[in-house]
């Protein structure tokens, strides 16, 4: 069994996350491909998709954005920065990831994706329910862009 840790941003994306989000999209694609390739050998592939988890990731991942030479980015950086407190309140404990890993490892199913936490479940359901243009507009509105 192969259990990969992705993120909800492997299936949807948010402002200022291009590089990180792309890495998670890669994990999703890799996992889907490996599922096809290894299924005949009896291997199970699982993907864990956490949402916002309580950690210092948000502050560390946004350090690049505070570069004064990225002047054109500053309005976006400021808008996203104003949301930081709200993101912190929404964060779920790391245990939701551990619970999703445990479920994936022990449920005996062929399920591929396991959202980790209620916020992840809600965000992915919201994305699945919307077409691309509506999702883009709603995301811009959510972040005040």
Locations of regions flagged by a protein language model:
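C-terminal beta-strand-loop-alpha-helix "lid" module of Rossmann-like NAD(P)-dependent dehydrogenases
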Residues: 43-85
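Active-site loop immediately N-terminal to the catalytic Tyr-X3-Lys motif
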Residues: 12-18
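Alpha-helical segment proximal to the catalytic Tyr-Lys
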Residues: 36-39
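Residue(s) in the substrate-gating loop at a strand-loop-helix junction
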Residues: 7
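Conserved cofactor-binding/catalytic machinery of classical short-chain dehydrogenase/reductase
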Residues: 1, 18, 26-29
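Rossmann-fold scaffold of SDR-type NAD(P)-dependent oxidoreductases
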Residues: 4
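Active-site helix of classical SDR
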Residues: 23
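Core catalytic loop region at the nicotinamide-binding pocket of NAD(P)H-dependent oxidoreductases
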Residues: 45, 85-126
